[in-house]
């Protein structure tokens, strides 16, 4: 993940408004946390959307992210709640933590922010280096279906929500363009803010690039970095993967040491 792909995360408050209610990962992570002792590492933790709920369950948490603004917001939230979470500003591809863990996870499809083969290799090497032998790595990434990759290149409606501060309706649209050679989707997100009369009073655009990995490609990638795939699901409810999946949730076990 690089600081040149951060536009979508430049406003941590907006990120929380749009994503804080999503907590589907928690049950599966709690299930695996119950089997593992010691601190748990949340890679690309953002504002602590998942880190904080797990800490509320009494787990020892370490959150790592490269984005200082997101990390500061996470720290502010955990301090208000009196939660002793360790927040660390580091690049996940160059991890240098004093702690090794039996459970590392990354949620929110953060794996897709590692755009090149080199970045993916460095990330998985970092994870391997900070996992105990037999430790578990859990992460998700969007499924590269035809529908997902061939989204229209024109402006398309996605969703609407209400921003309570101030009281505004926000209509969200997307434009996407898939680069088949690099397996990278270029997204533009357009947020149109409306007043109580339905008039558009503001518009914001952000850009982001996301790398897609195919299942067989991921299988070989994980094996090459010392991991065995224990489970592959289509969602966080542990539903078996199918051809019409929207995402892939991997539960992997470290089988051997790996160095770059």
What is each stretch, according to the model?
Residues 44-48:
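Class I SAM-dependent methyltransferase "Motif I" SAM/SAH-binding loop
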Residues 134-141:
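Conserved beta-strand signature within the Rossmann-like core of class I S-adenosyl-L-methionine
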Residues 209-260:
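C-terminal lobe and adjacent flexible extensions of AdoMet/dcAdoMet transferase-like proteins
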Residues 1-38:
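Conserved class I S-adenosyl-L-methionine
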